[in-house]
């Protein structure tokens, strides 16, 4: 979240006792063990027309993206069964698959019926069997559903493949003509739709816990203000209009409060608004910039970025009062804090001592170890899947802002397909079902 600290300073200009590091805090730069081989066979199709999406490929990609599974390439498959009775397990043992999924799609009264079965290849036993139905336009939804069910059955972790992603695009046509759009897509970048379009910048979009509303910063009328918008209807409401900076909105776990950053009293500080009464209270104070709030699950703790010690580091504070406690000690820059679902891991933008690269890193909050997750150089705005298995972040490739996905175990790193122009400010939805 290098860009947010930088962005605050830009906005302000345009609008014209730290503990020692524990010895157990160490930096880890390498990945972990290998992913589990799985084969997702192309699903059989009993209809005449060509389907708009390849369900097996979507399921395969989902499981790969989690970092837990390594799909067997189609070209390596000795056979391609569509149902359980056609499976020859020696074919799958020969290619090293530990799990196997087969499926079949049948037209039924204007809808599609999908049957699928997941096997343990070593034991030759069914792990999961199920069915789902919908229209051809819902193929991606059904594929993500199958991925969710399979992932949870195999790992015990709820799948996050049916979630959504918010992000901002900026397409420049001339020096004084840039179009900004707020987009919502599947978590993997597919099926993007425009929620808002503006000639002025849009920043920091965030899903509410109910998944039905979003908060964001808009520079309409040439000044930053925070809005809340209902996704289904497009109806929106201005939440803040204070002098100076209004930025970095963050919903409380129950959606009843909104944390954000204001500079109305001097330096940028974190405030919390009760969404029912619209009363605000101040959480941080003192010198320096305090920004990028992120709520803990208890609804009382806020993690945030502050340069109060000279360089940006992550702190936490209680919204009801009390001092701030420093959380990060490794590296000379740690910002944009996000917690995993179990609150055991802190994901952040990190810079090592002696280096100039900004990369996504994960800190084990119990042991203090920090692991570098990415190999890109100008990372920012990391956002974590609701089950904590994947991270999406903004970075630059070939001179263009893009979004990348990395698994929390560091095994998978890949770009997301997005629209033309600069792409930035990703934000992951909560579970939607």
Swiss-Prot record:
Residues 1-21 form the signal peptide. Keywords: Cell cycle, Cell division, Periplasm, Signal. InterPro entries: 6-blade_b-propeller_TolB-like, PD40, Tol-Pal_TolB, TolB_N. GO terms for biological process: cell division; protein import. SUPFAM superfamilies: TolB, N-terminal domain, Tricorn protease N-terminal domain. It is found in: Periplasm. One of its GO terms (cellular component) is periplasmic space. It comes from the Bacteria. Part of the Tol-Pal system, which plays a role in outer membrane invagination during cell division and is important for maintaining outer membrane integrity. The Tol-Pal system is composed of five core proteins: the inner membrane proteins TolA, TolQ and TolR, the periplasmic protein TolB and the outer membrane protein Pal. They form a network linking the inner and outer membranes and the peptidoglycan layer. NCBIfam families: propeller_TolB. Belongs to the TolB family. This is Tol-Pal system protein TolB. The lineage of its organism: Bacteria, Pseudomonadati, Pseudomonadota, Gammaproteobacteria, Pseudomonadales.
């Amino acid at each position: 979240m290098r860009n947010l600290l930088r962005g605050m300073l830009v906005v302000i200009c345009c609008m014209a006792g730290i503990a020692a590091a524990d010895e157990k805090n160490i930096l880890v730069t390498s990945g972990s063990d290998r992913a589990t081989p799985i084969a997702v066979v192309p699903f059989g199709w009993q209809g005449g027309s060509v389907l708009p999406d390849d369900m097996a490929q979507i399921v395969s990609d989902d499981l790969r993206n989690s970092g837990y599974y390594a799909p067997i390439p189609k070209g390596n498959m000795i056979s391609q069964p569509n149902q359980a009775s056609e499976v020859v397990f020696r074919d799958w043992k020969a290619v090293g698959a530990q799990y196997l999924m087969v499926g079949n799609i049948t037209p039924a009264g204007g809808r599609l019926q999908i049957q699928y079965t997941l096997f343990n290849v070593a034991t030759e036993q069914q792990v999961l069997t199920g069915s789902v139905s919908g229209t051809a336009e819902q193929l991606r939804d059904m594929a993500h559903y199958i991925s969710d069910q399979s992932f949870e059955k195999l790992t015990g972790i709820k799948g996050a493949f049916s979630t959504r992603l918010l992000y901002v695009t900026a397409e420049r046509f001339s020096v004084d003509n840039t179009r900004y759009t707020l987009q919502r897509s599947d978590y993997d970048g597919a099926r993007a739709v425009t929620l808002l379009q503006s000639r002025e910048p849009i920043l920091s979009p965030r899903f509410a816990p109910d998944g039905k509303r979003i908060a964001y910063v808009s520079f309409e009328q040439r000044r930053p203000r925070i809005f809340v918008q209902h996704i289904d209807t497009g109806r929106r409401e201005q939440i803040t209009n204070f002098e100076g900076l209004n930025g970095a909105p963050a919903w409380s776990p129950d959606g009843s409060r909104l944390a954000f950053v204001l500079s109305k009293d001097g330096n940028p500080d974190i405030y919390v608004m009760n969404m029912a009464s619209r009363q605000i209270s101040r959480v941080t104070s003192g010198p320096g910039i305090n920004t990028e709030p992120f709520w803990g699950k208890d609804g009382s703790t806020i993690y945030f970025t502050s340069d109060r010690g000279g360089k940006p580091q992550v702190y936490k504070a209680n919204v009801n009062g009390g001092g701030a406690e420093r959380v990060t000690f490794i590296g000379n820059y740690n910002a944009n804090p996000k917690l995993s679902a179990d609150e055991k891991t802190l994901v952040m933008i990190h810079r090592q001592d002696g280096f100039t690269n900004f990369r996504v890193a994960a800190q084990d909050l119990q042991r203090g170890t920090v692991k570098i997750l990415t190999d890109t150089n100008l990372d920012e705005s990391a956002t974590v899947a609701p089950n904590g298995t994947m991270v999406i972040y903004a970075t630059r490739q070939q001179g263009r802002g893009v979004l990348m996905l990395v698994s929390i175990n560091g095994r998978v790193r890949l770009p997301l397909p997005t629209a033309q122009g600069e792409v930035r400010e990703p934000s992951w939805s909560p579970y939607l079902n």
